[in-house]
């Protein structure tokens, strides 16, 4: 993985998506579900699809992961209450940064 900003904090990000997209020329899409009110007393969901920015498939992994994180962040910012904030993106810190794991309890 490579570190790239996610909500202003360096986050270790997978490079597999960018490598596969770069090698295959495949179209990359983002897909996510949004919880919606059905007015019928049970939850409903709306499925959203969006094309990823071209930079997600850049052969330079640093460019690809920065584009990936920026796009995911933009989706999360649409409705922050719908994002899975329990996913611990910042557990591993950049080497030599002096930053500590923000999830450790002291």
Please place each PLM-identified region on the residue numbering.
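Non-catalytic C-terminal accessory region of glycerolipid acyltransferases
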Residues: 1-106
């Amino acid at each position: 993985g490579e570190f790239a900003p996610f909500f202003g904090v360096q986050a270790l990000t997978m490079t597999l998506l960018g490598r596969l997209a770069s090698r295959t020329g495949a179209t990359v899409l983002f897909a996510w579900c949004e919880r919606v009110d059905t007015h019928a007393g049970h939850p409903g969901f709306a499925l959203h699809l969006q094309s990823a920015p071209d930079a997600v498939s850049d052969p330079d992994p640093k460019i690809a992961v920065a584009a990936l994180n920026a796009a995911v962040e933009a989706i999360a910012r649409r409705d922050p209450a719908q994002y899975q904030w329990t996913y611990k993106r910042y557990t591993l810190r950049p080497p030599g940064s002096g930053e500590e794991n923000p999830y450790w309890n002291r």
